[in-house]
């Protein structure tokens, strides 16, 4: 649905995007993850048409996004700055914006009702927006950008500056939009948001995509492995001897001490084979824990720094 190739943008001597490339399919929710200055907001600004002076191509549904007004109207853009009238009700704001989006008048009221239910504001549809909390306003802002049923929704840091409950609501909305078939790109520097919300992840740093895919695919790209900890009544030497013949490309002994040992495995399907060997060697294991690589591990491996650096 969306194909970005070699997108490059500079601000003076600063390279904000460096041959940025990305693909997105219908219904995919892609989290664009990176530290401040990675180029996330620049990308959203280019796609939304507010920043020019770049090179590269962006095709949306097989057509040039910037040369085809009709295709560009299939985007929904949710900026951090919210645009609505505080004195009007939530419903009246939706009706006003629906007119600007050329939503057919016969369909507009029904669409507004559907969206107020989606963002959990139906009970306060007739209330002036000035009475809403920051999180409620953020949800209404998202509803407005969904009025024309876009094929692609762009959100720049949608959970910044709102409380935890409001963040949960926004992320639920994003998941629901993706499940309904709309492709979504949202920028964030919050690992947990990406892990719980996205079907795919793109990790950015210094204007480039370092890797993209599902979390499992990213783990394979960086070569991270699951770590299995074994606890029990055994000697370090006995445990090491027991697993030595299993060690290889798929299994590695990381550490062994009396009563505690750790193995790295390429696939947790190896665990039953390991347990069989330990049982055969009479290694008394009383507990076992599997620690899978997470997004923070992958990010650190790719960038050499944490999001907080």
Task: Place the predicted regions along the sequence by residue.
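ABC transporter nucleotide-binding domain
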Residues: 171-265
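Walker A (P-loop) phosphate-binding loop of ABC-type ATPase nucleotide-binding domains
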Residues: 35-39
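Catalytic Walker B motif of ABC-type/P-loop ATPase nucleotide-binding domains
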Residues: 153-157
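Conserved ABC transporter NBD signature motif
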Residues: 56-71
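Conserved ABC ATPase "signature" region
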Residues: 95, 99, 106-124
């Amino acid at each position: 649905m969306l194909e970005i190739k070699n997108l490059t943008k500079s601000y003076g001597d600063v390279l904000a995007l460096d041959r940025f490339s990305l693909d997105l399919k219908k219904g995919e929710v892609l989290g664009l993850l990176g530290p401040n200055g990675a180029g996330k907001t620049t990308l959203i600004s280019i796609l939304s048409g507010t920043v020019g002076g770049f090179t590269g191509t962006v095709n949306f549904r097989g057509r040039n996004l910037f040369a085809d007004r009709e295709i560009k109207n299939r985007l929904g853009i949710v900026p951090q700055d919210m645009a609505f009238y505080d004195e009007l009700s939530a419903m009246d704001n939706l009706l006003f914006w629906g007119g600007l989006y050329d939503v057919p008048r016969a369909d507009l009221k029904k669409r507004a009702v559907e969206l107020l239910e989606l963002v959990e504001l139906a009970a306060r549809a007739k209330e002036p927006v000035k009475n809403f909390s920051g999180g409620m306003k953020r949800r209404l802002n998202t509803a407005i950008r969904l009025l024309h049923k876009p094929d692609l929704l762009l959100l720049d840091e949608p959970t910044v500056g709102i409380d935890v409950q409001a963040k949960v609501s926004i992320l639920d909305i994003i998941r629901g939009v993706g499940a309904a078939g709309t492709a979504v790109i949202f920028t964030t520097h919050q690992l947990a948001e990406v892990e719980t919300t996205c079907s795919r992840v793109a990790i950015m740093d210094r204007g480039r995509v370092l890797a993209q895919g599902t979390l499992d695919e990213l783990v394979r790209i960086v070569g991270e492995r699951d770590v299995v900890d074994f606890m029990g009544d055994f000697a370090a030497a006995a445990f090491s001897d027991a697993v030595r013949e299993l060690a290889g490309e798929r299994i590695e002994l990381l550490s062994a001490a009396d009563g505690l040992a750790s193995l790295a495995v390429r696939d947790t399907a190896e665990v039953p084979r390991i347990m069989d060997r330990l049982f055969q060697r009479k290694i008394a294991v009383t507990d076992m824990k599997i620690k899978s690589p997470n997004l923070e591990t992958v990010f650190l491996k790719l960038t050499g720094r944490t999001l907080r650096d």
